[in-house]
């Protein structure tokens, strides 16, 4: 018994921050950003009283409405995020309380940009084991809350957003979440993409704030190089393990980190541009939100049909990366 995605949903804040907006506060320009990343604009959740749990709750409510079920029917809520409202309680618990899912338990999963891919496969295990009937998996980040808008190497890349799915047992054999390969490399990845402040190693202090340690820090060249190799490798591995070809794959759904990384992954798979889901130009990198937002948009546009073969791939801080093969129910 495999787990199948039965519902998708997304939430993007209304406010748009364009490249032209960034030109006013950073030493950069639209052409430079677009050429190197493919990003034209991103969404920002400006309200200081609204955080990641707000976006997750909006997604959760949409999922329930679309599926036509009550919150009481949800057994488990997994939230993938690296920008929780607070260290504890978990964002998943906040969402559970907000939608009053009284029969659900939940937890947060921290795998940065790979979070949703990790969460999807994790959630699928609870369906396959028979311990849960309905699992909600949400990927969300309020990246604007941890961005240094004086640092053009990171400020141009990220936006705010959330997406999610409901997992249930597949109706037929051969459909649903059929395979996954997940990886980590904490030896080589830990120093290249991180937010050093706020944890038990560097708890908040005047010094950590003054040194901008509560913002994302990254070595862009190292991360780019690692991401290109890892995403392409895991995509190729998923294809080989499941006898998939460029012709039989209907959609590559990649993490929206950088247009060049996405193109390199598609090229390695031999997949044409028409089969690659990309919305990075409109939303930037919403980290854990990218893949589920892409799924929701494909679903909304009627591009997912019974039997559609999807390969989901992602890469994030850690390093973490992975791929999931889904055959749409």
Curated annotation (Swiss-Prot):
Subunit relationships: Homodimer.
Species this chain originates from: Chlorobaculum tepidum (strain ATCC 49652 / DSM 12025 / NBRC 103806 / TLS) (Chlorobium tepidum)
Catalytic activity: malonyl-[ACP] + acetyl-CoA + H(+) = 3-oxobutanoyl-[ACP] + CO2 + CoA
Keyword check for Cell division: no
UniProt keyword terms in alphabetical order: Acyltransferase, Cytoplasm, Fatty acid biosynthesis, Fatty acid metabolism, Lipid biosynthesis, Lipid metabolism, Multifunctional enzyme, Transferase
Similarity comment: Belongs to the thiolase-like superfamily. FabH family.
A single GO cellular-component term on record: cytoplasm
EC number: 2.3.1.180
Protein name, UniProt field: Beta-ketoacyl-[acyl-carrier-protein] synthase III
Domain comment as written in the entry: The last Arg residue of the ACP-binding site is essential for the weak association between ACP/AcpP and FabH.
NCBIfam families listed in its UniProt record: fabH, PRK09352.1
Record region (ACP-binding): 256-260
Function: Catalyzes the condensation reaction of fatty acid synthesis by the addition to an acyl acceptor of two carbons from malonyl-ACP. Catalyzes the first condensation reaction which initiates fatty acid synthesis and may therefore play a role in governing the total rate of fatty acid production. Possesses both acetoacetyl-ACP synthase and acetyl transacylase activities. Its substrate specificity determines the biosynthesis of branched-chain and/or straight-chain of fatty acids.
One GO biological process term: fatty acid biosynthetic process
Location relative to the cell: Cytoplasm
Keyword check for tRNA-binding: no
Stretch forming the signal peptide: none
